[in-house]
Amino acid sequence: MNPIDTDDLEKHTPMMRQYLTMKAEHHDMLLFYRMGDFYELFYDDAKRASELLGISLTARGKSGGDPIPMAGIPYHAVEGYLAKLVQIGQSVAICEQIGDPATSKGPVERKVVRIVTPGTLTDEALLQERQDNLLAAVYQGKVGFGYATLDVSSGRFVIAELETKESLEAELQRTNPVEILYSEDFGAMELLHHFKGKRRRPEWEFDYDTSIKLLLAQFGTKDLHGFGITDARLSLQAAGCLMQYVKDTQRTALPHINAITRFNQTDTIVLDAATRRNLELTQNLSGGRDNTLAAVLDNTATAMGSRMLQRWIHQPLRDHAQIFARQTAVNELLETTAHESLHDQLKALGDIERIMARLALRTARPRDFARLRQALNLLPQLQQSLAQLSAPHTVKLGQLLGEFPEEQQLLERAIVDNPPMLIRDGGVIREGYNAELDEWRGLSEGATDYLVQLEAREKERTGIATLKVGYNRVHGYYIEVSRLQSQQVPLNYQRRQTLKNMERYITPELKEYEEKVLSSQGKALALEKQLWDELFDLILPKLHELQAFARAAAELDVLSNFAERAETLGYTCPELSSEIGVKIEAGRHPVVERVSQTPFIANPVTLHNQRRMLIVTGPNMGGKSTYMRQVALITLMAHIGCFVPADRAIIGPIDRIFTRIGASDDLASGRSTFMVEMTETANILHNATAQSLVLMDEIGRGTSTYDGLSLAWSAAEYLAQQVGAMTLFATHYFELTQLPELMAGVYNVHLDAIEHEDTIAFMHAVQEGAASKSYGLQVAALAGVPARVIKAAKHKLHQLESRDHQVEGANVNGTRAPIQTLLALPEPVENPAVSKLKDINPDNLTPKQALDLLYELKRLS
């Protein structure tokens, strides 16, 4: 049966009618339906939950004549199951009992009180501590895309206007959202195929006017001019859909979402999706974090600092003034060793950014308040440390930290030192904070003394030495005696419970005291919850300032971390230049040098206006790819304000970094390895500029030798002569080493190796000039290819080389043609239809002539 079919509700029991009605309202997610101590799932939800969570699938009688599939989880274990579900992109609606079973006629009143989706998480137990948790929305216009992201756990709201699919793909790669909303007519689904949490939304949710009204209401402004986004129409439509979705799922005010910013690609170095993937910035090729740039650079003290660092890595700055401000701050922290004390102080702050989001949503727990109190207690100490520093950026961050003496004192008075996890059972508000609460608690807490006195008195009165007075949650207070002595109890003892060897009684006096104590406990708990709610009202007026404190602390953490990494890993401060070029002395790969079992061989690189392209040759396993990647990573690190693994680095203006390194089949899109390679190459050739850094590795491998050589030659020629980009072009086509002889600005470099008999030693050192050979057979031998195969390969290689010397490049006269002649592209021939079109004057054509001309153009094309 389909559980959202509510046409025949009368066939079902009252409880199942209630369930089916709620399920119809939340048909696109699992419904956790609270029944006593369990959350139950029925019908298809039960089957899916059983499959996803590995829980038992049973049946609950019949309703409407059919057995009801059912699965359940204990309420106290729900967070663990929710974590599993959101990790695989599943959303859950949580339906609680809000009525009293004792007074309910028919099914207990229930209500969906919480919706958990991957992109709207704020609960600490469900979030990845050191990763942003982004909800995204994308809207496709006639030209371009609108893209919006929101981190509900911090309030960070960002939009971007993107002109092409490639730009959207790069943004998806950069932001890596855990949940994506898209419109019904979205036409680029191939870009979303590997994302788990995809949600198709109706077209009307992207309506422009509705979106503007939603955003104005959220920010409390008359217009959006102050945010500088009024012309970002498509992304505002995406932002409106996203905002509505968050309101629907959170079902509460969202005061921490109080601003929206626009991501402009012109402010940062553009990294396309392939580049982010190939450089393994925050995610390795296997999808993990090990052996990535972030893993090496991240020794931050706080989770919010770690998340900010990863955002910086994906958004290298172009503005040298901003970079220099960061560098100056890092340099001062390093020289004064202030980074050491700052690290310890920041570590004690905790994740204030996410705590403030939970406070805004009123879902914060007692320990969140305790952590906030601890952070505010540390502020004076942190301010004192910063007072010794004079770098302008550090001073600015110190001012943003702010001061919160009233909030600190409030939390000190209100919250106990070590509060429980939940407010549910009380014990959170400190004694002395509220006189009425202390009075009610006094009645309850005095029960222990009273019970001791009552037990002694009753033992003496009855003569039963083993008599005990106790309490449990089910039966309340009781007097317990053994079965054998039950004949001796006084007449005013009323039997309350019979056990195997014991009888339990209550007296009118004890009953009266029980009611008094339980009443005081209930009143104390109710008052404590009221005081707890009031704490939110007292703290939230400073929400914006506390959010600024969190952001400033996170940035201080990143800068302090850069200083520590520079000291620990031997990094130097890169120099920024206004002249185009990249000069690195003794550069090292930041990741490889950390994981290598042998000392890393440092290498230089020099690129400038007169030396724009390096043809990189050398043996397989010689280190060409490592060398190229380290140049890109050092350049990127310099543009986030980080020191770099080199003796010296001088970096000029960079607008984009492109990489065409490695490839594999894109099965989901039906593209072969060669097609992927050519697509990435086309993107580079179309978009690279004279200020771009381009890494091209082994272009043309996936096709025939001459096809591949032709493509590699032409791509290198185009980059060198038409684009003028700073390029490292690695190849095994030795014909390309002739390029420096044919065009200015192109130079050969190679990675060296030493051959001795049948063995080879890789030197990993970059030398000027072209390599002499590729050593492919020696590498094959190292890989364990059988000796017979290697021997046969040597024989075949000798045959091929002999034939090539005789045949390759021979023309009709038997002379060898120059390689540039062989590979030169033919002059383009203009299409006859285009020539005809150029001669047409449309203003002089009659309708009949225009129609005849259309047929002629069709024939010519």
Swiss-Prot record:
Q: Which residues form a coiled coil?
A: none
GO cellular component terms attached to this protein's record:
cytosol
The residues listed in the UniProt record as binding ATP, with positions renumbered to this chain, are: 618-625
Could you confirm whether the keyword Ubl conjugation appears in this record?
Answer: no
- SUPFAM superfamilies, from UniProt? DNA repair protein MutS, domain I, DNA repair protein MutS, domain II, DNA repair protein MutS, domain III, P-loop containing nucleoside triphosphate hydrolases
Identify the CDD domains for this entry. Answer: ABC_MutS1
Q: Which UniProt keywords apply?
A: ATP-binding, DNA damage, DNA repair, DNA-binding, Nucleotide-binding
Entry's InterPro entries? DNA_mismatch_repair_MutS, DNA_mismatch_repair_MutS-lik_N, DNA_mismatch_repair_MutS/MSH, DNA_mismatch_repair_MutS_C, DNA_mismatch_repair_MutS_clamp, DNA_mismatch_repair_MutS_core, DNA_mismatch_repair_MutS_N, DNA_mismatch_repair_MutS_sf
Give GO BP annotations, semicolon-separated.
mismatch repair
GO molecular function per UniProt: ATP binding; ATP-dependent DNA damage sensor activity; damaged DNA binding; mismatched DNA binding
Name the domain of life this protein comes from: Bacteria
Q: Which family does it belong to?
A: Belongs to the DNA mismatch repair MutS family.
Database matches in PANTHER family: DNA MISMATCH REPAIR PROTEIN MSH1, MITOCHONDRIAL (PTHR11361:SF34), DNA MISMATCH REPAIR PROTEIN MUTS FAMILY MEMBER (PTHR11361)
> What's its job?
This protein is involved in the repair of mismatches in DNA. It is possible that it carries out the mismatch recognition step. This protein has a weak ATPase activity.
Name this protein carries in UniProt: DNA mismatch repair protein MutS
Could you tell me which species this protein originates from?
A: Shewanella sp. (strain ANA-3)
State the organism's lineage.
Answer: Bacteria, Pseudomonadati, Pseudomonadota, Gammaproteobacteria, Alteromonadales
Per UniProt, what is the name of the gene that codes for the protein in this document?
Answer: mutS
